Amino acid sequence: MDWDDEYSHNSFDLHCLLNSFPGDLEFEQIFSDIDEKIEQNAASIKHCIKEIQSEINKQCPGVQLQTTTDCFEWLTNYNYSTSESSFISHGDLIKFFKTLQDLLKNEQNQEEMTLDLLWDLSCHSSVSFPSTLSGTSFHFLSRTSLHSVEDNSSMDVKSMWDDIRLHLRRFLVSKLQSHNEINNSQQKILLKKQCLQQLLFLYPESEVIIKYQNIQNKLLANLLWNCFPSYNRDSNLDVIAHGYQSTMLKLYSVIKEDFNTLCEILAPSSMVKFIKETYLDTVTEEMAKFLENFCELQFRENAVRVVKTSKSSSKHRGAVHALVTTECPQKGRNFSLPLDKVEFLSQLIKSFMKLEKGVQELFDEILLSLKITRDTSGILEKSDREVVMEKPRANETNIPSEQSLPGKEATLLDFGWRSAFKEVSLPMAHCVVTAIEGFSTKILQQEQNERSSAVSYAMNLVNVQQVWQDSHMFPEEEQPKKIGKFCSDIMEKLDTMLPLALACRDDSFQEIRANLVEACCKVATAVLQRLQERAKEVPSKAPLKNLHTYLSTAVYVFQHFKRYDNLMKEMTKKPIFLVLVQRYQEFINTLQFQVTNYCVRVCATSILQDAESHHWDDYKAFYEGERCSFSIQMWHYFCWSLHYDLWTILPPKLAQEILVEVLEKSLSLLASRYARAHPSRKRTPQLRLDVTTILICTENMLWSVCTSVQKLLNPHQHTDDKIFKIHTHCNNLFTTLVILTSPLTELYKTFQHGLDESASDSLKSFFKQPLYWVSCISHFYPSLLRTPSAGGLKAEGQLKLLLSQPRCNWNLLLETLLHHDGLLLRILLKSSKQVSDTENNLNQGPSLMEAIFKILYHCSFSPQTFANVFVSYMEEEQLWDFLYNIPVSTCVEYELEVIRCLRLALTDAIKDTVQQIVSVMSSRRNCETNLNKHIVPDCLLESMPKEWNYSPKETNRKESCKSFTRLTAQAVSIVISKLPTVIACLPPPVKYFFFLSERKMSKKFVELKKAGLLVWNLIVIICRIFEDGNTVELLTGASLDRWSKEKLGLICMCLKSIMGDQTSIHNQMIQKVIQSIEQQKPNWIERQLLKARKLSTECAFMTIEKSTALQEGDVALELTEQKINTMVLDLCHKPGGREYLRQIYHIMQLNEEYLKEQLFSMNSSEEKPLPIRPLKTTLRSIEDQPSAFNPFHVYKAFSENMLDQSAITKWNWNWAKLLPNYLRLDKMTFSVLLKNRWEMKKDETLEEEEKAILEHLKQICTPQNSSASDNIEEQ
């Protein structure tokens, strides 16, 4: 709405767009709203310029401005000093100041009134009050001239003015000091700004800065005194380092407050100078004093130690330097520092670097806002090229723009904290190498002692801590899980020392960094040599598991030094540890090959060497034909033990690479061996059982080595080479099974006419499809693997693939959660109601309901999942009445979790609207408060010079203040105007949810027909926020008085009336407000509500169309890998998004068996569903925690869940269906496999019919027969 008597300034908060992926209609509404606000702002500026133009024409009769350009030119060229002045009686000035002086001395609480009066005289009556102590005369702007007071007694006026200023300064300084006690940062900044602006009105900037600097210096002194611990010989260095870290954090918060306070008051150069002199220089001085005391104590300790040991020979490098007499000068002295002291100094440097980085970021924000470019070398230099223009003072004379403005060199923040470490830098440079080499040698020696004391050495492992969580250099899938303890201890110490190298700038700390880099290289090389030595001990002196540990440890060190290089490249411009990193990379590649090669060799030469099981010529059945070979079982156990070790130690990606390669190569070996097997009649069932067992075991392992559904169901020959080869080997094994073990009569029926060359291409490649072997055994072994043509994975398959991964795969997790319209999430929500109070007390984080809500809320590409999950939940729990009547206060006795989540989501959407309404009300309230509070006394008005033409505000109150009706109408219009844009910026899932919910409720609630359930709830929440003062204060930080609450209450009643509430229909004030809106824009409210409803339903219609298209098989609309990845990235950048995903994954892990049972029950034909059980949400006992690898557990799971060997022998194979698929089998392959059949053995007794069949099959695949048939065709 346009209010002609207002200078409105409208803005659009673009951050709300980041919560969703708006569609075309939403973007159209958002851009329309932005355009409308730009037009309103332009109209407001134009109106303001017209008023200025009119005022100039009125005040200056000789000037007639016709256009906006004329107005700007006149204002730009106007010069106070060249104007004519009218005379003001000197006695009048003395009378006014005398009255003002007496008023301040004799009356209390007149300071605010005085400051407002002086400001009004300066702004509206054009009276200029000097801020300097001397040399300035009072003058005022009349219609035609400027006149300076000149009188021999002018010093009396200046003396009186100085006395008034001094009184006001004391008042303002006292306020400034009291503001430091305020806890609310935003309120403190606002109040400080007001005080400083008032001081700058009275005094020059330099004096104000000095005074404020003194105030802040006292604050800083108290902070340093209370937080900076002192140092002595018995001090705990860890406590001192922690004290400095906490002090730096508090100091940064104080600096940040002053940045925000001064950025709009002072020029950047002045502000930078203030921050530097007040805080940075002071803390540097304090650190210099601390380090001076530290050095003195260290020097004395070294001197005493040297006197005691001077007669004995020194065993440590650098001991000669410690032999310094007490008469040596202070500067340049050297002393040794033990490891704990070097670590302590490194922690101090880290604290300063963190403060430096924070202050630099604050300064960069200011430079960016002022569009000032600067050199990339940081905040530690002074730039001669950059110029920052000083901000104009309110009471200074304007200078024409055509004249060149004098520029000030911008002094960039020069934080010289490194100078405080100058005295200690030389000892640190000398001792850092000794310290690092000393502790690394000690740790390596401890590892050697452990190795020497054990016959079979199993290295001590530690879990890798998540370091550098703010770094995305190495994704989770590449980070090790466990490493050798000795390496962890060494790298932990190096991490502690790293700040010594990172602190290097230009010439400072150069020697320290050089020595540190040299020591790190020596230590890393020693660790590499130790790992190489230990790797050679496998398998003769150490188990295979150690090899995984060495590989994981090498990856850990490699990533550390890559990270070091990345952190130092800003200073060094080139990688420092390049050679070292390359050596580790080569070692990692070698170890990976060694692990893979060793595992394959073990399979080939040991595990699969099974003379008893593979005695294929034996005419006795192997265990009555009801057991597979021992070697196959051992191969299965070996693969799963390897799987366990890789999953618990190595980085997930590397673990899968190794396992898939071992699986592929061992399958290649098995396929080759079984293709060459020539079993007897009694041993042929064993071969069939062996191959079937291999295929079932491989199917079970595939879930672990495939990282996506695409790789699992449709691997590509080039991008998924290893997976594709595994399927090829399995297809070859199954080919062996079919040709070698099928009944001879069935084989003859299929191949009696030869290998059919006329078969189609689809038939030719059918038995070579990746999942062909799975489909062949699925009749007997119901695998969860399903080809895309068969509908892809079910929910059980998605769950199995997700939980088979070595880590939480975010993309796969989200895909599983969204699968089948959130089927798993619906199960979790049902079961979450059964979670015990004990479980809830153990879980201090967000609830499962909140985690599911937050995840689905931001899945903009799958709005139907959010809607279906929560609509079904609301339906089951019968919560529709709560949805119609959402509370806003958190103080309600009991609030359902899903309703609370909805309330918070909608409250966040209308927060900006509430903020704008409260801002309008607060500004109006402040206006009325100032008018009523700061009334100028009559005695002061009477003493005021008439030439000033001052008119009190009270006389223009009716003209300057809006009526009560117009204020309410403006607030209501803001709410209604913002509704469409608020809905446009809501994520599609919540809009579709309210659309479906409205269908459930519309018959019961007639009011919803006007604007829809979503609009209704937004209005209701806004009203209830306004009715609850506590919620308003929490959202906006504004405290409301009785007047504001009454006005907000009236706004609520108007909004309810618009939405159809009949209780306030007879209220005249409400009707008056609504009529005033309608008079300005007829039917505008109704159009806005219809637009909001359209935006809330359009998304729903699009979702319905999409669901229909998917049911009809439109693949383009499915959730592609790219869409899943986009939503995962969006979720991980949302506050708490990663934690919500991890929490759901953790609960799914703990309840895997229960979820499988529920999914199986839903798919079965049983009418009675399984009972709902409470979910496990925490590991409550040792039994729940994963234990070491247990082969008996694997055997039990293998025999009970995967493979019933006796049942497999009774499988009724459908040979008539299987064999025709091999009509285009290669003749050579068919010939070799045919020769290996038991019937081809010389000593086998066959019937005549069987002999004839064999002869016929031989002729089919012999080259002679092939060439003869070719000759016949040519003839």
Swiss-Prot record:
The keyword DNA-binding does not apply. It comes from the Eukaryota. Keywords: Disease variant. InterPro entries: DUF4495 (IPR027993). The keyword Ligase does not apply. It is linked to Polydactyly, postaxial, A10: A form of postaxial polydactyly, a condition characterized by the occurrence of supernumerary digits in the upper and/or lower extremities. In postaxial polydactyly type A, the extra digit is well-formed and articulates with the fifth or a sixth metacarpal/metatarsal. PAPA10 is an autosomal recessive condition characterized by one or more postaxial digits of the hands and/or feet. A rudimentary digit (PAP type B) may also be present. Intrafamilial variability has been observed. This is Uncharacterized protein KIAA0825. It comes from Homo sapiens (Human). The gene is KIAA0825.
